[in-house]
Amino acid sequence: EIPLRLVGSEMCIRDSYSEMKEFFPNNHVEYFVSYYDYYQPEAYVPKTDTYIEKDSALNEQIDRMRNAATRNILENNDVIIVASVSCIYGLGDVESYAAMTLPLAVGDNVEPRDVYKRLTELQYERNQTNFVRSTFRVQGDTLDIFPAHYEDRAWRISFFGDEIDDIYEFDSLTGKKTASLQKVTVYPANHYVTPRPAISQAITGIRKELAETVENFKNNNKLLEAQRIEQRTRFDLEMLETTGHCKGIENYSRYLTGRKPGEPPPTLFEYLPPNALIFIDESHISVPQIGGMFRGDYNRKKTLSEYGFRLPSCVCLLYT
């Protein structure tokens, strides 16, 4: 069983995390909260005709901890998750996330270029000069990978032709070897990573809804809204086709995860096993808070769809 402790207050969650680490020193105690230092959601105010573009500042440390949390849920049984109410927001599909992993083992026969390509598909960036989290670099027959869940450690993969000859862990700052490894598994750098076939299928569904939405706006003499939704969605589709990602990709979650209209999006709860235990701290505060988050998100997205900033399917992206 994997326990999840849901804490309503962002201030109290740090204390809860420290307590769990102290009570269970031999367990994988993980921290899962919103990874934004600053977050301004996309919104539209009809009264003043004001469109507010999504703006945010990502906290790298918390993003690393979120990646460590989902990875350990899938790999270990001794995991305890301390989470804030933000865990009810949509997260990438767990099946796609797990399917996109890249296992590497000593003795594997694999073309190095194929490994580089797969890392790019996992949203890892090739960077020869600035070796940081979620990047990789190549030096001759050596590949260095800085996993998304690590803070100061990385992996070195040595090739001999098309065979993996050696794998070891090293300190990312000093380069000192810290452990010899027989195998590693690289998890996606982003929870919204989606396999290419799923992206192609999603694009087909998005185009169909776009055509229906444009026609509906035109039939109701809402020409500005029709032009707006067509222009914005087509740009997103181009980005999805070329890079597999786009700004505001969470608004297309229904298609990327293959859900039906009205079905809730995957969240952290989908990553947990069926026998997981969930504890809600101060439920008299946390539960109403969740309800308020639901209503606020619903109204915001409904307005965006009514005025042609987003497709109607974005309103389905509500948490359970």
Put a short name on every predicted segment.
Residues 9-20, 36:
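Conserved Walker A/P-loop ATP-binding site and its immediately adjacent core
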Residues 1-8, 13, 319:
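Single conserved hydrophobic/aromatic residue that forms the stacking wall/gate
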Residues 26-34:
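Conserved RecA-like helicase motor-core motifs
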Residues 5, 20, 82:
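Hydrophobic/aromatic pocket-lining and membrane-interface residues
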Residues 35, 39-81, 85-318:
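N-terminal cationic and glycine-rich segments that engage phosphates or anionic surfaces
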